[in-house]
């Protein structure tokens, strides 16, 4: 798929070129993986439509969504998003899995779930896929399910529970260098509060939905201080804007590689 680059230099690029330019694993620190979050929003700032984020994005957003999955060691997602979006195998395209292996990655990224309550939807397709590896960090005891997927549960002290603790575990115990967070809005807000987001990929869809109930991309209480963003690039396709931001003060902002 071709995209129109608006910034920094106008040009036509492909999704494959965008993916190959990311180099996310090279930006990891010894302490934790490099973390990017991918979110979608309507033009009036809503992150869900009829309770889901999936219907908001168009073809370009979905192409970039899958391209990002093809570039990372792990995908982190909240239990609510797992449940609502009915997650299955993270990389379904065989060619993408082969390309991952050529780059030194596993065929599929690890699926990482961080939960305080321990209530993980074990009935979703992800746990029925024998090719999937799921790592769960929980503040409450969880019995690993008897499922075709490989599932590892790590208990966290409730007093030390947090995204930063889970990310350190992914880096030290699983060798994860790059993490893609797919939300939802509560998870993104928690990660921003802990200052563990390095980059934000945000698609703004040409839709207006109105209302006061739908969440924004970062839900919950306001952040202690606004998180400043630095635009890395802006792409467009059929009215969809795909924006890549570096989070000010985080790793990689000065090292990001524009397409």
Give residue ranges: language-model regions:
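Enzymes that bind and transform nitrogen-containing heteroaromatic metabolites
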Residues: 1-259
């Amino acid at each position: 798929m071709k995209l129109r680059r608006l910034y920094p230099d106008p040009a036509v690029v492909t999704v494959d070129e965008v993916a190959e330019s990311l180099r996310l694993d090279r930006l990891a620190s010894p302490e934790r993986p490099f973390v990017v979050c991918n979110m979608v929003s309507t033009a009036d700032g809503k992150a869900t439509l009829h309770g889901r984020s999936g219907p908001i994005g168009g073809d370009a957003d979905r192409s970039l969504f899958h391209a990002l999955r093809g570039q990372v060691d792990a995908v982190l997602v909240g239990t609510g998003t797992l449940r609502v979006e009915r997650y299955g195998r993270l990389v379904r395209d065989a060619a993408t899995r082969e390309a991952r292996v050529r780059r030194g990655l596993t065929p599929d990224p690890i699926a990482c779930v961080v939960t305080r309550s321990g209530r993980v939807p074990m009935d979703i397709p992800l746990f029925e896929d024998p090719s999937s590896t799921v790592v769960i960090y929980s503040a409450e005891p969880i019995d690993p399910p008897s499922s075709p997927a490989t599932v590892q549960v790590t208990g966290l002290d409730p007093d030390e529970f947090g995204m930063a603790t889970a990310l350190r575990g992914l880096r030290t115990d699983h060798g994860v260098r790059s993490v893609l967070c797919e939300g939802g809005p509560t998870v993104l807000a928690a990660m921003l509060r802990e200052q563990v987001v390095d980059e934000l990929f945000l698609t703004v869809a040409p839709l207006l939905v109105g209302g006061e109930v739908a969440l924004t991309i970062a839900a919950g209480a306001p952040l202690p201080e606004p998180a400043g963003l630095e635009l890395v690039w802006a792409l467009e396709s059929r009215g969809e804007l795909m924006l890549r931001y570096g989070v000010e003060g985080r790793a990689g902002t000065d090292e990001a590689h524009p397409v």
